[in-house]
């Protein structure tokens, strides 16, 4: 379990836009991918890396 998230690793949960999970692995949590991913990014992947600019990361360029 992520100490900052109430759901189990790899489980299904409803992480809201205000989710504070730092490494949330919830399959339904889109926010956990990256803080720099634009809203609605179809390729958003959990654990992607920000490249500096607020709108660029390793999965949504």
From Swiss-Prot:
- Asked if the keyword Metal-binding belongs to this entry, the reply reads yes
User: Binding positions for a divalent metal cation 4?
Assistant: 33-34, 44, 48
> Which organism is this entry from?
Sus scrofa
The record's PANTHER family line, in alphabetical order, gives: METALLOTHIONEIN, METALLOTHIONEIN-1G
Q: List residues binding a divalent metal cation 1.
A: 5, 7, 21, 24
Q: Give a single Pfam family match.
A: Metallothio
Record's keyword terms, sorted: Metal-binding, Metal-thiolate cluster
Protein's name according to its UniProt entry: Metallothionein-1C
Q: Which domain of life is it from?
A: Eukaryota
From the UniProt record, report the name of the gene that encodes this protein.
MT1C
């Amino acid at each position: 379990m992520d100490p900052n998230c109430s759901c189990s690793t790899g489980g299904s949960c409803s992480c809201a836009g205000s989710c504070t999970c730092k490494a949330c692995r919830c399959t339904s949590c889109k926010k956990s991918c990256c803080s720099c991913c634009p809203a609605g990014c179809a390729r958003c992947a959990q654990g992607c890396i920000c490249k500096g600019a607020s709108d660029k990361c390793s999965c949504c360029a």
